[in-house]
Design a protein with these regions (language model features):
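Active-site lining segments that contact anionic ligands and/or coordinate catalytic metals
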Residues: 281-283, 325-327, 333, 350-353, ...
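Feature for exported/extracytoplasmic and membrane-associated proteins, marking the mature portion
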Residues: 1-321, 341, 357-358, 366-430
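Metal-dependent active-site segment of extracytoplasmic phospho-/sulfohydrolases and closely related
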Residues: 319-344
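Catalytic phosphate/nucleotide-handling subdomain of diverse soluble enzymes
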Residues: 346-347, 356-358, 362
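Short glycine/threonine-rich loop-to-helix capping motif typified by GTGT followed
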Residues: 295-300, 336-352
Length: 430
C-alpha cells in the first residue's frame, strides 16, 4: 500500500471519542507452549507425558481450567503451576486462551503442507524470519508491522501522533507503520536525548549548538530534516515527561526485579497520562527473552512463566485501578511454538502455539480456535510434534483490530493475507 493510499485510509477512519489500547507481549526465542497450556484429561495427559518424557510437568502440579464453553470430546486443559496469576484472570473471565495460532498465508492442511502445494510462510522454524512474519505478516526485512499499520489508521485521532505506537523494549517492526513512527521509551520513562542535556558530550557548548541546530533552518535538506526530527524528539520527551509527572503513582504493585513487569508498569503509567497527551488509540510493544530452550527447559522455563504471570496480572490490575480495563487488551506472541517431543533436555523449533488474550472486554474463561490432537504423527503434526496452525496470525490480529475500531474494509491494508481466510472474526470479545 502506498503512503498516499495509507494517508487516505487514515483520513477516512471514523472519528473516535473513546480510548483503546492494544498491548503486544512478545516472548522472544519461542515459548514452549507444551509446558504452558497442558492437556489435563487423563487420556490426553497420558499421551502428553509419554511424548514429553522428562520434560512433562507432573499432573498434580497443574492448574486445571474450567471454561464456560467445554472443549469437545471431554478434553480438558490446564496451566503450568507458575501461572497462578493467569489462572485467576481466566477464572474471573478476564482472559481467554487462543489455541494453535501461527503464521499462515492461506488455510493449510497437513496433506498440502507435505505436498508443498500451497504458499507457506517464508523460512519456517527460523527465529529472525518468523519473528518478522509474526510481527509484520510480511517476510523478514519488512519495514512495517501490523501494529504500526493499525497506528497509521488512527494517527489523526490523537492529539500528538508521536504517541500512537510506543515501544518499551527497544526496537521492533511490530510498531513501525508506513507513517507511524515507533516512539521508544525505557521502563522508567522518556529517554533523554544526550545531545540536548545541559552538558552533552561533556560540553555545554555542544548542547547549545545542538539545540540551535534543532531550532534553526538551513538551505541544506539534510540539516533541515535533522532539525525537524530533533525538534519532534525534544517536544515528545518534554510532553511525555510532563504527562507522567502529572498523574498519581499507581497503587498496584509491580515486581521491580521482573523486567517484563516494569515494562508493563510503564505502559500503565503512559495510559494514565492519556489525557495530558491527547491520545485515543495507542499500540504498545513489550517483550521478554530467553525462551529458546533447546536445553535446560525444566530448570529455566518455570522462571520465565512466573515473570509472565506476575507481569500480566499486575498490568491488568493496574488497568482496573485506572478504570480502563475494558479499553485495554493485552495479548502474547512469540516466534513460533516448539516441538512436543523432547530432544533430551529441551524442545526444538516448532510452528503453531497457544497464546493468551487478556482484558476486561475479552470474552474470557474460554478457549478460542481448534484444540490440536496430542500425538506425534497425528493430524496436526508436521513432524516431531510441531503443530500445523489452525488459526492464522492474520485472523487473530483482525479480531483485535476490529475491537480496536478498524472497519472491515480496512483490514486487508493491515493484514495482507486476511482475505484468504473465512469471513468473520474470532469471537474474542464480549
Amino acid at each position: 500500500m502506498s503512503l498516499a493510499a495509507m494517508g487516505d485510509a487514515a483520513a477516512a477512519t471514523a472519528p473516535v471519542n473513546d480510548y483503546k489500547a492494544l498491548v503486544c507481549v512478545f516472548l522472544y526465542g519461542a515459548n514452549d507452549h507444551g509446558n504452558t497450556v497442558v492437556p489435563y484429561d487423563s487420556t490426553n495427559y497420558a499421551s502428553y507425558a509419554n511424548i514429553r518424557a522428562a520434560l512433562a510437568t507432573p499432573y498434580s502440579q497443574l492448574l486445571p481450567l474450567t471454561p464456560d464453553v467445554a472443549l469437545p470430546s471431554g478434553a480438558q486443559m490446564a496451566l503450568a503451576p507458575q501461572l497462578t496469576g493467569l489462572k485467576s484472570l481466566f477464572d474471573a473471565g478476564a482472559m481467554g486462551v487462543m489455541l494453535n495460532v501461527g503464521t499462515l498465508v492461506v488455510p493449510t492442511t497437513l496433506a498440502q503442507y507435505k505436498a508443498q502445494s500451497v504458499p507457506l510462510p517464508p523460512k519456517l522454524f527460523s527465529h529472525n524470519d518468523q519473528q518478522s512474519v509474526w510481527q509484520s505478516s510480511l517476510a523478514e526485512g519488512a519495514t512495517s508491522g501490523w501494529g504500526g499499520r493499525l497506528g497509521d489508521l488512527f494517527l489523526n485521532q490523537n492529539g500528538t501522533s508521536t504517541f500512537t505506537c510506543m515501544n518499551v523494549s527497544g526496537n521492533a517492526v511490530f510498531v513501525s507503520g508506513q507513517q507511524a513512527v515507533q516512539y521508544q521509551v525505557s521502563s522508567s520513562g522518556a529517554v533523554k536525548l544526550n545531545a540536548t542535556a545541559s552538558n552533552a558530550f561533556g560540553s555545554s557548548a555542544v548542547s547549545k549548538a545542538m539545540l540551535a541546530l534543532s531550532q534553526g533552518s538551513s538551505s541544506r535538506w539534510m540539516e533541515n530534516e535533522h532539525a525537524r526530527i530533533m525538534a519532534r524528539a525534544i517536544q515528545a520527551e518534554a510532553q511525555l515527561s510532563s504527562g507522567l509527572a502529572g498523574v498519581p503513582a499507581l497503587s498496584t504493585p509491580f515486581n521491580a526485579s521482573n523486567p517484563l513487569a516494569m515494562q508493563l508498569q510503564m505502559v500503565a503509567r503512559t495510559i494514565a497520562a492519556r489525557g495530558a497527551m491527547g491520545t485515543k488509540r495507542q499500540v504498545f510493544f513489550v517483550s521478554l527473552g530467553g525462551f529458546d530452550l533447546h536445553d535446560n527447559l525444566v530448570a529455566q522455563h518455570p522462571g520465565l512463566l512466573t515473570r509472565i504471570s506476575e507481569a500480566l496480572s499486575s498490568f491488568h490490575a493496574a488497568t482496573v485501578e485506572l478504570g480502563v480495563a475494558n479499553q485495554v487488551t493485552t495479548f502474547t506472541a512469540s516466534d513460533f511454538g516448539r516441538t512436543l517431543t523432547s530432544n533430551g533436555d529441551g524442545s526444538d523449533h516448532g510452528w503453531g502455539s497457544h497464546h493468551f488474550v487478556v482484558g476486561g472486554a475479552v470474552a474470557g474463561k474460554r478457549f478460542f480456535g481448534k484444540l490440536p490432537v496430542t500425538a506425534v504423527n497425528g493430524p496436526d503434526d508436521v513432524g516431531q510434534g510441531r503443530l500445523l496452525p489452525t488459526t492464522s496470525v492474520d485472523q487473530l490480529g483482525a479480531a483485535l483490530a476490529t475491537w480496536f475500531g478498524v472497519a472491515d474494509s480496512d483490514l486487508p491494508t493491515v493484514f495482507p493475507h486476511v482475505r484468504n481466510f473465512a469471513a468473520g472474526t474470532l469471537p474474542l470479545f464480549r
